[in-house]
Amino acid sequence: MRETVLEAVLRSADAPSEAQRNRFAAFLKKQYGQEVPLRWEQDPALEKGFRMEVGADLYDWSLEGRLRQFRERLEQLNPAGVSVIPLMREAVRNWQPDAAPEEVGSVLTVGDEIATVSGLEHAAYGEILQFSSGVKGMVQDLRPDRVGCILFGGSEAIESGSIVRRTGKTAGIPVGDGFLGRVVDALGMPIDGQGDIPSEGYLPIESPAPGIIDRQPVNAPMETGLLAIDSMFPIGRGQRELISGDRQTGKTAIALDTVLNQKGKGVVCIYVAIGQKSSSVAQLVENLKHKGAMDYTIVVNAPASASASLQYIAPYAGTALGEYFMRKGRDVLIVYDDLSKHAVAYRTLSLLLERSPGREAYPGDVFYLHSRLLERSAHLSEELGGGSMTALPIVETQAGDVSAYIPTNIISITDGQIFLESSLFFSGQRPAVNVGLSVSRVGGDAQTKAMKKAAGALRLDLAQYREMEVFTQFSSDLDETTKRQLIYGQGLMRLLRQPQNHPYQQHQQVILLVAALDHVMQTVPLARMDDFRTRLLTYIETQDQALCRRIDESGQLSDEDRETILKLSREFLTRFQTEAAEKSGE
């Protein structure tokens, strides 16, 4: 094997003496195991100290270099509530400049949030690079003669030929309880104008997903407060449930209602906005504040105006924040809104890095892009604290095409999907859940016994109604049984309509399901169904508070409680019909 030919270039204001040259030669032979020729170049700017370059290694013994080393040493101090002054004194007293080399490279090209760098032979994938302008980048492309990196700041100050340094670190984000109630960017920096956030540590944005032994089955419900979902497609803590649908079909509304429903339940919520309008995110934050939900929520925002690099790392940063709380034994709900824009940002970066395009111009590893993200959501074993992270990824479809590339990828990764249909949405059926295409694969085990007993054959009844509705379009002559079934199905569909920002408690869902599936509401006109539903809940909550409390606390529905609900429902129905008759008589 041929020995690598090296040359050392020494730069300083004054020429080295013969004794100094001998010391440099001895140092280089010890460091590289061979004789390294030394060439001196004058640099008037280096009045105090010197710089020596050997291949890609830089020994920076200038005043600027030593000050930078000292600053980095101070930045490593982590007082965690302890006075930093004694630590600084000790650091100053014990500090010695490091004689180890830095691996430096130079910028070849820069533009479109991408920089190519030569000379960094040992740079690792995902490593953070420091540019001389102060901008940081992350290595995303490794070639024999250069590396490609994405930039986390403006590229205007970066010039071709400028110096780039390795940091030896991967991208990370500060974490801590202080992030609750705050809005941060993809790097964990506050953007809500409320000052700095005290951090309790630093976690890498990319980390391995928990293994099989580290997990336990999904066995606790993550209630959304939405009757259509909790009854037929229940979500468990630690599950990944996709929310899919066209533009303006209520995808974000479902996720936000789920966040609002966690109030008082000890769940930490993280909302990751990817490529959204800043005005929409600001309105969302105001809504959460108004409802008192920001106290337990963190918003990570990489808006449409942010670079593709920040949009790419945003969901990983949000997941790292979630993992901090999950490892402390907390339950976490994380919403990714939305992963379609995340995939587009990654496609943009990949094409700029000159990677080979595949289907729909996405790179070949776009499946891994989302699988490594969503696999980090889990219900941890009791040995690891028993915490959980539930993921609600949102994906936008085009003209209801569920078979497109990104939707099918994420369907195969997640534990179920809630598919929203435009025709249902615009007909007033909101949430516009398509009962036939939606499914929850593991949440059924987490559903409370009360909900399971109350929901009964709801999904089957709705499927029969939808099928019958199609056939009745071709026939006007219907028998009485068919008419009754159609009226019953229409009543169920009307019952599942729910206004935004009004999640139901568990006992309210149980009451409505028990009454509806026993045909108590069969005679209520559709136009008055909303009024009947609201007043029925108020009536039963007033008449039997102990019943409601019992269902909420135990998650059980005894036969006696079921009969009580039916008895009170029929009592109220009689009263409701009497009032309606009196009004019509007037």
Model-derived features: positions:
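Elongated, mostly alpha-helical coiled-coil "stalk/stator" tethers of large membrane protein machines
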Residues: 1-82, 123
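Phosphate-interacting basic helix/loop segments used at nucleotide- and nucleic-acid interfaces
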Residues: 32-36, 86-95, 225-229, 318, ...
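Short, charged, intrinsically disordered terminal tails
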Residues: 66-91, 574-586
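N-terminal accessory targeting/assembly segments
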Residues: 80-182, 187-191
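P-loop NTPase nucleotide-binding/switch module
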Residues: 162-164, 171, 175-178, 191-239, ...
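Conserved P-loop NTPase nucleotide-binding/switch module
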Residues: 247-274, 278-280, 290-292, 308-419
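Conserved catalytic/coupling modules of large nucleotide/cofactor-utilizing molecular machines
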Residues: 341, 351-586
